[in-house]
């Protein structure tokens, strides 16, 4: 069991100006990380950020702490999170640090680390960093202080990496694509990747100003993308979140295509090409339609806990190469070491180009089940509503009514006193009624 005080499942995150996302904390974090990572040999760390205004302040604090510990910082400027995983590997840096709060609003920020191999930092190393933070900062001798420099071709390197995951024999020259970069870290990457592969690109959400990241654009709000795809009569739309590790797509009719559908397309294409190894990993929230569609293809499917960290763990446990969350995290271990929105999107585009099929048609083999989610607030400290007999009884009744053609999932939020009630089945009216019946039982406790 982990005793970590600051690190969560995806690094350290919070509201800027409130602990722990403060300049003094981040400076000490940089120093503590430097002390731990310096023990492993290399003395250079890559530092990247998304487009939040607070990134300037936090990268300076990190760099000062690292320098005091004797490590040098290599700045990339705004870059997608998966780009840092790639650059950390290619530069043989001891670690990569990303300053980002992903899909959160601009006033939040966070810090996460990648190991030298481009994977998330092991728990043991995060715990060692936290232990170091309990000590007083001490500076190395002046001659051993770290330096700071910039990787001037970071964007170009990553663009070429992304393009290399798209088959040489294919082209996007017949596609008109609207790309929404969420005013985030992909704003200068994704449009160029698609254009260099031949696509006719219309870019939105590519004017970051420090405070508009994820604001009514991007993977968490595709309404602007849907409207633009229809207005431009485009073949499809592609949306990324603020740090580029999520992708959501929109077909030519304006229908949203989520991470479950994206994984279905990629897994089916891998099967057709004889490249699929093993099965596919989803989460407890993955649509039942995905599980049934993969079963029809003979592709094994497993569910992990919600969170890309747990998806990756399950993939590694089973030796499988494809995993995804319906929120748009898609992990393709044959291509990269972490979730990469651009790379995942390119694999869908390759399937479209190779089969001369629209995104809409590629999704047609998978029927999405209606999935109703109701959040119920409860009084903290009043006991666990999920253990109450009345809630268990109603849940059992609903599960019996759904049989093997539906699911019930009750989850407690990890950050606030909420119970998330999810009911999934073939009939939307029925699952809506069932979800509210369970929610009412939770409220009555």
From Swiss-Prot:
* Superkingdom classification of source: Bacteria
List the GO cellular component terms: cytosol
- E.C. number: 5.4.2.10
Q: Which SUPFAM superfamilies match?
A: Phosphoglucomutase, C-terminal domain (SSF55957), Phosphoglucomutase, first 3 domains (SSF53738)
Q: How is it modified after translation?
A: Activated by phosphorylation.
Q: Which Pfam families match?
A: PGM_PMM_I, PGM_PMM_II, PGM_PMM_III, PGM_PMM_IV
Instruction: Output the InterPro entries linked to this UniProt entry.
Output: A-D-PHexomutase_a/b/a-I, A-D-PHexomutase_a/b/a-I/II/III, A-D-PHexomutase_a/b/a-II, A-D-PHexomutase_a/b/a-III, A-D-PHexomutase_C, A-D-PHexomutase_C_sf, A-D-PHexomutase_CS, Alpha-D-phosphohexomutase_SF
Q: What is the enzyme's class at the highest EC level?
A: isomerase
Q: Which GO terms describe its molecular function?
A: magnesium ion binding; phosphoglucosamine mutase activity; phosphomannomutase activity
- The active-site annotation reads 102
Catalytic reaction annotation: alpha-D-glucosamine 1-phosphate = D-glucosamine 6-phosphate
Keywords from the UniProt entry: Isomerase, Magnesium, Metal-binding, Phosphoprotein
Q: Which PROSITE patterns match?
A: PGM_PMM (PS00710)
Metal-binding among the record's keywords? yes
Annotated Mg(2+) binding lies at: 102, 241, 243, 245
Cofactor requirements of the protein: Mg(2+)
Gene Ontology BP annotations:
carbohydrate metabolic process; peptidoglycan biosynthetic process; UDP-N-acetylglucosamine biosynthetic process
Which free-text remark accompanies the cofactor?
Answer: Binds 1 Mg(2+) ion per subunit.
**Modified positions (Phosphoserine) in chain numbering:** 102
Query: What range does the record give for the signal peptide?
Result: none
Q: Report the family membership.
A: Belongs to the phosphohexose mutase family.
Q: Relate the protein's function as given in its record.
A: Catalyzes the conversion of glucosamine-6-phosphate to glucosamine-1-phosphate.
Q: What is this protein called?
A: Phosphoglucosamine mutase
Provide the species name: Shigella boydii serotype 4 (strain Sb227)
- Gene (name only): glmM
